[in-house]
């Protein structure tokens, strides 16, 4: 039970840190927020949600008992995904810094978990093909005049990179 309390506390504190990161990212992009929708993030409900959601998900991670690296990786993915979703919901923008962070996290994962150069190359190729396939899938609607934001296409490509071909 103590372990779950620690995970929940780490989730609360991490969520609070990422909440302030989201506030900063919204403030930086305030030039695009002509209707001041980004100001909604100052509402106490958003702060609570930004803290409670990671806490609950971190306890879920604790229940699965992953190894240390995978636990940290999943926690970072959750925090970055919450920020991407929250910022996109508030101001309709997806920060490239978060997408880059997710790409770097997956590259670190490939380096850490691959045993040698052959495994690294296979895993990286698998992830890269996932990126390409996701990108193509989300670009196709644009040819039919369906509106999908460029940030959504980039985010989908990053998710494709993280999942790889086997993730589909």
Residue ranges and their predicted role:
Residues 1-168:
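A membrane-topology feature that recognizes alpha-helical transmembrane segments
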């Amino acid at each position: 039970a103590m372990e779950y309390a620690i995970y929940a506390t780490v989730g609360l504190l991490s969520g609070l840190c990422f909440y302030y990161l989201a506030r900063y990212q919204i403030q930086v992009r305030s030039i695009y927020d002509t209707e001041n929708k980004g100001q909604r993030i100052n509402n106490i409900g958003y702060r609570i949600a930004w803290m409670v959601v990671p806490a609950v998900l971190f306890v879920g991670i604790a229940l699965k008992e992953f190894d240390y690296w995978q636990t940290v990786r999943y926690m970072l993915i959750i925090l970055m995904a919450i920020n991407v979703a929250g910022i996109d919901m508030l101001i309709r923008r997806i920060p490239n810094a978060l997408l880059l962070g997710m790409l770097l996290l997956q590259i670190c994962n490939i380096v850490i978990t691959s045993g040698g150069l052959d495994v690294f190359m296979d895993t990286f190729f698998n992830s890269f093909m996932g990126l390409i396939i996701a990108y193509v899938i989300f670009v196709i609607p644009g040819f039919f005049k369906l509106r999908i934001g460029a940030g959504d296409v980039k985010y989908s490509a990053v998710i494709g990179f993280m999942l790889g071909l086997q993730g589909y």
